[in-house]
């Protein structure tokens, strides 16, 4: 490099080793000018023996650490910039035996500059972008690191004026520059791909979390609410008005009906009001019957339980004394082959929750294991069978008596009972309220959890809200309709000899409702004891130990007579005929003549009530 004095400076690049950097090529650089000159690219001869290190090595002459001066020159003199785009043609370099047919791309994130010791400091920017285009073939691309160029060229990055390169759309997406162009491109691709995937995931998660709203379907059997007196009047008069004025719109008809209703006499209005009141009463009765029917419908579920191991031998279950001071800690299961009854009754609806109960927060459950000798003689069973009786409220300690039948004596070896404190309290409360009439409440729900026939026991869980009976496929059933005496269920508690107490529990009567049959057996036996009093409802499953042809399913059908509403009559005054079912007049008239006469009477009364000056034209 030489900078001869004068107005013009010349930059000469010489290279003794390689012929493509000849000293004959000089670049004219005016001193202290404000203009920038675009220098054409240097044409390089194709030499396959050159490598990247050879090309970069010829820029070592440009670095002169001793010639760099302080920054006062930059502040005192204007800095001149030379843009030197270097183009390297196809087949210039060969590295590792692979032909670099795609060209060499060197993208510098920051321009490289240096200061020279000449009077006007000159900064040489060598942006190596915009290389040979269109030559991207199957070969690999060679990327030169910025730090490598800095070390090879010996150029200081912060000494001269740094020109920011033109940013591409990909560069604008990147937040921090990467030292390597390949890493920079990978980071850009990763940055461009990452946000859409995250957004997609968020949208999909939001879609999954959003649950569609389901509207509750209206039961067609539910009774419809009655309409008002004005609505009844509107039904009666709009047909006559539409018949006389076919072209009248609904708004006009509504205005006419409203004026007719306002001018209607109080007596005629009372007729419609009485009809509305009667319809409301009928609606309330029908709604009460509908709700009773919904509550009494049984939901049948089957619960399969593991059978008992075959090696188990029948042994008498232990007997737990009924201690009113301490509840039983656990329930006892009977032997697998012993004929017995297991009843689980949750008395939460009849007994207040006790804070001092053994299991905090859990409902008090009483499990009664009763042998078949305790059942009344009116219920017949097959030999070796087991009958499960579910009364409305089960409270017992030593015996269970149904109806007026006597209770057979039970040996301690055949009976195991566990009675909690809440059961005894319920029995005491029931004994205190024996003289009171039974409240009209629905019987507690029955949920039966049967087992396979090998275990020979049935577990029944009672819960207050819905009436549920659970049956199992293997057992065979029979059906019996029982009507018991006014005290249909007598529970006799005989703890120690010193304490004797007899409690009568009367299950509440139930409104009559259609009963869902649960009988699946071919044989059905019906036994009835007719009494005009209350009827108790229970479902009993028989699980015989030995398969026998006679099978029974006991079910008590509850019902009570309903008062019939008076016979409806035709709406037209003076007509005593019953109404005819028709959609046109809402089952309120007996014939078309009554409809016409009634509408005519109403319309004429409305016309007569208007002022005499008002003229009504009827087409």
From Swiss-Prot:
GO terms for biological process: positive regulation of transcription elongation by RNA polymerase II; regulation of transcription by RNA polymerase II; RNA polymerase II promoter clearance. Residues 320-337, 512-524 have a biased composition (Low complexity). CDD domains: HMG-box_TOX-like. It comes from the Eukaryota. It is found in: Nucleus; Chromosome. In liver, recruited to target gene promoters following treatment with dexamethasone and cAMP. Binding is decreased in presence of insulin. Component of the PNUTS-PP1 phosphatase complex, composed of PPP1R10/PNUTS, TOX4, WDR82 and PPP1CA or PPP1CB or PPP1CC. Interacts with PPP1R10/PNUTS. Interacts with FOXO1 and CREB1 (increased by cAMP); FOXO1 and CREB1 are required for full induction of TOX4-dependent activity and the interactions are inhibited by insulin. This is TOX high mobility group box family member 4. It comes from Bos taurus. The lineage of its organism: Eukaryota, Metazoa, Chordata, Craniata, Vertebrata. The gene is TOX4.
């Amino acid at each position: 490099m030489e900078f001869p004095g004068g107005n013009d400076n010349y930059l000469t690049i010489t290279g003794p080793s390689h012929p493509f950097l000849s000293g004959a090529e000089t670049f004219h650089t005016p001193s202290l000018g404000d203009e920038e000159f675009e220098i054409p690219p240097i044409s390089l001869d194709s030499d396959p023996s050159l490598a990247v290190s050879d090309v970069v090595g010829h820029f070592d002459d440009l670095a002169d650490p001793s010639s760099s001066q302080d920054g006062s020159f930059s502040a005192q003199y204007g800095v001149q910039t030379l843009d030197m785009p270097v183009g390297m043609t196809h087949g210039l370099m060969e590295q590792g035996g692979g032909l670099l047919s795609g060209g060499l791309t060197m993208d510098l994130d920051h321009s490289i500059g240096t200061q020279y010791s000449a009077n006007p400091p000159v900064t040489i920017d060598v942006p190596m972008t915009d290389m040979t285009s269109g030559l991207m073939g199957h070969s690999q691309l060679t990327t030169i690191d910025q730090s490598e160029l800095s070390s090879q060229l010996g150029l200081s990055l912060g000494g001269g004026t740094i020109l920011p390169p033109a940013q591409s759309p990909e560069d604008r997406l990147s937040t921090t520059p990467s030292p390597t162009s390949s890493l920079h491109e990978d980071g850009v691709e990763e940055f461009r791909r990452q946000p859409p995937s995250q957004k997609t995931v968020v949208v999909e998660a939001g879609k999954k979390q959003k649950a569609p709203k389901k509207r509750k379907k209206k039961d067609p059997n539910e009774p419809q609410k009655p309409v008002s007196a004005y609505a009844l009047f509107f039904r009666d008069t709009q047909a006559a008005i539409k018949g006389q004025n076919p072209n009248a719109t609904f708004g006009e008809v509504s205005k006419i009906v409203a004026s007719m209703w306002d001018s209607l006499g109080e007596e005629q209005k009372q007729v419609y009001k009485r009809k509305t009141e009667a319809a409301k009463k009928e609606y309330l009765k029908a709604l009460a019957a509908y709700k009773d029917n919904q509550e009494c419908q049984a939901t049948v579920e089957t619960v399969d339980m593991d059978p008992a191991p075959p090696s188990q031998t029948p042994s008498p279950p232990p007997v737990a004394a009924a201690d009113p001071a301490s509840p039983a800690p656990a329930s006892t299961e009977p032997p697998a082959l012993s004929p017995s009854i297991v009843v689980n009754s949750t008395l939460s609806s009849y007994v207040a929750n006790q804070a001092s109960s053994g299991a905090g927060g859990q409902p008090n459950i009483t499990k009664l294991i009763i042998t078949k000798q305790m059942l009344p003689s009116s219920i017949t069973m097959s030999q070796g069978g087991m009958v499960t009786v579910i009364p409305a409220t089960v409270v017992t300690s030593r015996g269970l008596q149904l109806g007026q039948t006597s209770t057979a004596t039970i040996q301690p070896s055949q009976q195991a009972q566990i009675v909690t404190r809440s059961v005894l309290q319920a029995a005491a409360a029931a004994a205190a309220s024996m003289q009171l009439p039974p409240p009209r409440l629905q019987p507690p729900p029955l949920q039966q959890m049967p087992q396979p026939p090998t275990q020979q026991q049935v577990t029944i869980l009672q819960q207050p809200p819905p009436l549920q009976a659970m049956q199992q496929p293997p057992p065979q059933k029979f059906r019996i309709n029982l009507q018991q005496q006014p005290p249909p269920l007598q529970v006799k508690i005989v703890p120690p000899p010193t304490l004797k107490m007899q409690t009568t529990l009367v299950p509440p009567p139930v409104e009559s409702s259609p009963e869902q049959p649960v009988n699946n057996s071919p044989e059905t036996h019906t036994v009835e004891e007719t009494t005009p009093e209350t009827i108790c409802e229970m479902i009993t499953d028989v699980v015989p130990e030995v398969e026998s042809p006679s099978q029974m399913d006991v079910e008590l059908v509850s019902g009570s007579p309903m008062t019939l509403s008076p016979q409806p009559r035709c709406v037209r005054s003076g007509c005593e005929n019953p109404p005819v079912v028709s959609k046109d007049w809402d089952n309120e008239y007996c014939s078309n003549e009554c409809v016409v006469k009634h509408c005519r009477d109403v319309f004429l009364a409305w016309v007569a009530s208007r002022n005499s000056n008002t003229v009504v034209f009827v087409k």
